[in-house]
Amino acid sequence: MMTKYSSNSSSQSFAKIRTKHTSKRASKLFSAMLLIAGAFQSPLAIQTLHAEQPANQLTRAETVAGWKLLFDGSSTQGWRNYKKDALSEGWKVVDGAIVREGNNAGDIITDKKYKYFELSLDYNISKGGNSGLMFHVTEDNPAPWQSGPEVQIQDNIDGHDPQKAGWLYQMFQPYPMRWAGETEIPDATRPPGEWNQLFLRISPRGCEVSMNGVVYYQFRLGDDRWKDLVEKSKFKEFPGFGSAGEGYICLQDHGNKVAFRNIKIRELAEDGSIASPVDGKLELATTLAFPNLQWEGWEPVDEDGTANTPRRTLELTFAPGDAKRLYVMDQSGTIYTFENDPNVQTANVFIDIQDRVSKWNAPGGNEQGLLGLAMHPKFTQNGEFFVCYTKPETHESVISRFRVQADNKLQGDPASEEVLMVVPQPFQNHNGGAIEFGNDGYLYIAFGDGGARNDPQANGQKRSQLLGSILRIDVDKKSDAAAYQIPADNPFVGVDGIRPEIYAYGFRNPWRIAFDRKTGNLWCADVGQDLWEEVNIVKKGGNYGWSVREGAYAFGNRAGGPDAANSIDPVWAYDHAVGKSITGGRVYRSNRIPSLQGKYLYADYVSGGIWALSWEDGAKEAMRNEEVVAGGLPVVAFGEDANGEVYFMIDSGKGQSIHKFMQK
């Protein structure tokens, strides 16, 4: 459902590469010439392009997930020079960063050795500058790079080294992901004067390097490919290179000014796993909500023995004013209805529009099909309901109004379709498509950025079109230009160059939105690309960062627009060691399970975990994250009935797709 990446490591020929470590004298001379010429730009003279978390602090989510600071922004405690007991005077703490700014500063290492870990840091390199991040460093050699593999750090514009920032020196480099349409080697670095975020994972499950949120490459320490690349590099002269199994983290002095901050590390278990990032566990179990339910017109297996397309239920909802009935939407294009009774036997077809809906099980169509259903607040009077689906062939997203049949309110009328909106989609993924009515009576529509990797059309921040946004429209009125009106208090009404339908923007792939019936808060889970999954509280006019930010962190090197500095951070985020594809849920308002009351339930499709999040109005971050299910349940969506009971849905070849929670 939610697209992920796959990658194969790549390297380059080293026959003509000028080695980095033997050119230090030239580097120092070059740096000195820059200083004399007045061309040096301090790495601390930052051009602020994006909203930033306070430096050298952990978010609550990071703390719960096991991250720790290696630098607190005020002291150099925990660091020393290579083969020394203390830190030289060439390294200073300046404005919350540890800065190499003096002569003979020397390479510095952590006091502690690390085996398996994830490391994240921000660096700011001077014009033409060069540095590096090494791992598994031992003190058996004259220089740390003779034992510890190095992730290159340099100014890619004016730097002299052919090994670019983020490359594993003379070993691995990024490569274009051709399946995503990339044709050039990616360079996600930002220029001197701006902070870059470097991420490194060293794990028995596989290692990875990312630059500003973009995965560069993956590798395995010590495998045949690794050994082959070592033999082709200068490191073959050092028998212990990259083979210590553990060692110090090292920041390199290459004779140029460089600054580091937000140096964070999380140690991994021997198998590469992490502890569950939760504040506690709820004593709950799950069960089929309607164990006897059969779907009209659908059987698990055809008469010839062929398995049918599994049930993929993306919406379970109710019509306001009718607590006795549920409406369930299948991604294939069929909506069913049945009594809200655990002993119910049959789900009857409410409407079948498969003839106009693209197939989600077709090649590339996993995030297409019938994606959204919302019953009009006055459905019991006017019989109106709304859907979002993707069209076959053109792959456009369609928002339509339907009505029930005149003589049967339990049957939708396929011929009653009134198209409100058609939105072109450049790719087949990140369609979004969740729709909800707010307490204000307006229809809210969530669209992703249009798909592929890295938001190639910059739709997340491009408000002249509708992708990457949550829209808000009045479906009870029409205008001369459309079959709906724009609410007068929409945030961008009358603003030149911005579509007035936009309520909030900066989303990558909002996989389900939901209103809290008690507070009116709009919750949105946004599926991340390579590092972070988000839970957001959506505010009118808010910019949620994509694609200049992912979660609360920098992404890529695209310049942000005028409002990027005010982007809103998620109230909760988790990294890809926890899960890789968030499924947004709903706030539990039933009285049946007191321990869930008022908590936002969400899941991860890849890890199969389910959690309950506690949050208070006005808080920047969620107060508590509790485990409901440890893993193994690939939840595709959540639903809610008139009583505030929350259900969750998984794919099922047997048709048993709807589940609920229960006390143990």
Where are these regions (language model features)?
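Carbohydrate-interacting regions of secretory-pathway proteins
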Residues: 49-273
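Beta-propeller blade signature
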Residues: 399-407, 459-475, 538-539
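N-terminal secretory signal peptides that target proteins for export/translocation
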Residues: 1-25
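Acidic, Gly/Ser/Thr-rich repeat motifs that build Ca2+-stabilized beta-propeller blades
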Residues: 118, 130-136, 271-454, 512-515, ...
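Short edge-strand/loop segments of extracellular domains
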Residues: 135-158, 214-218, 331-335, 342, ...
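Bacterial N-terminal signal peptides
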Residues: 30-43
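Conserved blade-ending motifs and adjacent loop-strand segments that build the rim/top face
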Residues: 507, 620-642
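Short, conserved, GDST-rich strand-edge loop motifs in beta-rich repeat architectures
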Residues: 446-466, 532-534
